């Protein structure tokens, strides 16, 4: 009898925005080894939403311009200001995020991006 073992499929959601998300996902992938099938998806880049798709590149640019980053941090710091930005972004990207979560019917989805706990 020739039975093929189907491995569980684990999807990890990250963004390359400097928080170590990819490093965490890669460490999990290494620890899980060949017991599971994994993929790592950058939610921002794959959001299908202009502006959000560019966030990793914007973040990288801001790392090179700390004074501008500081001004933006000061201007955007606070729950109300954060909500004013995140709510429209969520509305714009939520359909695509739901697709990214369910595509391929993963057995487990691990969100390693604290900004996007959906």
Regions found by a protein language model. Give the residues of each.
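N-terminal subdomain of nucleotide-sugar transferases
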Residues: 1-46
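A short, structure-level motif marking secondary-structure boundaries and short turns
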Residues: 12-14, 81-83, 102-104
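Structural motif
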Residues: 14-15, 112-114
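Charged, low-complexity surface patches
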Residues: 21, 90, 108
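Conserved N-terminal ligand/cofactor-binding loop architecture of enzyme catalytic domains
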Residues: 27-100
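Short N-terminal targeting/anchoring amphipathic segment
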Residues: 94-113
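Conserved small/polar residues in nucleotide/adenosyl-binding loops
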Residues: 116-118
């Amino acid at each position: 009898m020739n039975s093929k073992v189907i491995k569980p499929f684990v999807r990890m959601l990250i963004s390359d925005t400097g928080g170590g998300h990819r490093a965490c996902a890669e460490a999990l992938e290494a620890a899980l080894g060949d017991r599971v099938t994994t993929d790592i998806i950058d939610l921002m880049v794959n959001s299908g939403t202009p502006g959000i798709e560019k966030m990793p590149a914007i973040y990288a640019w801001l790392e090179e311009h700390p004074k501008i980053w500081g001004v933006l941090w000061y201007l955007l710091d606070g729950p109300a200001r954060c909500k004013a930005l995140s709510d429209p972004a969520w509305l714009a990207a939520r359909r695509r995020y739901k697709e990214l979560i369910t595509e391929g019917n993963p057995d487990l989805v691990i969100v390693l991006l604290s900004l996007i706990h959906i």
